[in-house]
């Protein structure tokens, strides 16, 4: 079986949720939430996860508008992603992330792990959903 090493990213203005997968590519797991301070800091933290997980690809949630168009936030995500892809020298695949934060919050509530204070948990869970969708689409 081919080994898969991908990082799933939920990129927001304030935070980046990060998820990874097991080598079989079956299960995505939330890893961390990066508090965004500067591009350089974002890259350094992502680079550490890329090295640690031996990531071969970045799977990024793209926040399409409900009508399917690319709005302002989606274009910002693409711009940031192009930059990190270039610096980290990794390919990128996008996943439609509409409503993943809503789904993430619902999952955390059902698991009794939801806190209005921990926005990072939602971002991390959203990254997990994004990566899991991508993994499932490859089967």
Swiss-Prot record:
Domain of life according to the entry: Bacteria
Under which EC number(s) is this enzyme classified? 3.1.-.-
The enzyme's first-digit EC class, named in words, is: hydrolase
Sorted alphabetically, the Gene Ontology cellular component annotations on this record are: cytosol
Q: Does the record carry Cell wall biogenesis/degradation as a key word? A: no
Instruction: Please give a single GO biological process term from the UniProt record.
Output: rRNA 5'-end processing
Keyword Nuclease in the entry? The reply is yes
Q: Enumerate the GO terms in the molecular function aspect.
A: nuclease activity
Under Pfam families, the record lists: RuvX
Signal peptide, first to last residue: none
The record, for InterPro entries, names: RNaseH-like_sf, YqgF, YqgF/RNaseH-like_dom, YqgF/RNaseH-like_dom_sf
What job does the chain carry out? Could be a nuclease involved in processing of the 5'-end of pre-16S rRNA.
Report what the protein is called: Putative pre-16S rRNA nuclease
The scientific name of the source species is Rippkaea orientalis (strain PCC 8801 / RF-1) (Cyanothece sp. (strain PCC 8801))
